[in-house]
């Protein structure tokens, strides 16, 4: 939905590629009641049932959903800083997902797509969300992704919705989601979905 109209509930200071994932993850785990729809803004409609296995408001992690270090979950992790409200793209990839494949035929809706651009010194990792068949304007395709372009001091960036088939021909080869591209790390699934 952020592609069509950014929710006022999405903090403008966190609008980047990983911020889109964090926002979507949190909001997916909330109860989608009348108060939620009012908070999200006009135009939001139900598109999936609530996640019954986890309730953000009552869960042990609260808003601190993102693991920040290696290791299997232990009870003391809830108190020792192993979980945070923030995760950049690298942290999402390293501690919160499992590798699926570089083959797009293995991807499922909700999987994350990671790129690594080592020449970008501050944030070399970039993440996109694979949505598969889009709810609106799918054009009969099932290879849609959404992502935030990132912001700069002069540009707040934007959320884009594009097909993998279009990205396959991106003018900069480093952004092509092809198995032959070493900058394309592949598809990853959130550990919470495993």
What residue spans do the PLM features occupy?
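Low-complexity, Gly/Ser/Thr/Pro-rich intrinsically disordered linker/tail segments
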Residues: 140-194
